[in-house]
């Protein structure tokens, strides 16, 4: 039987996430979180067809789907904004909207439209 890491074919991109976080918010990303680039089907089987990235609170892990119709760097930043607003009770609430659309998006601009 293939190892779970092999079947998921994940690629750790935590360092890229940490560098991006530091550029946006000028503080350290929480140390115990890991970020992985995975096949989109891994995410979509568990969370629905329209989901490209997911934040797994219990595992302290962020999964970003590759080969989706959305740019993977934008999905990464989208999920980092969720991590930044972890205590907000609403999924895409006003604090998340501010962090993603008013802080991260203007700073990164067209760089968001790239693939990892």
Enumerate the language-model features and the residues they cover.
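Active-site-proximal or metal-binding-adjacent scaffold patches in catalytic folds
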Residues: 1-74, 83-116
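Walker B catalytic acidic pair
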Residues: 79
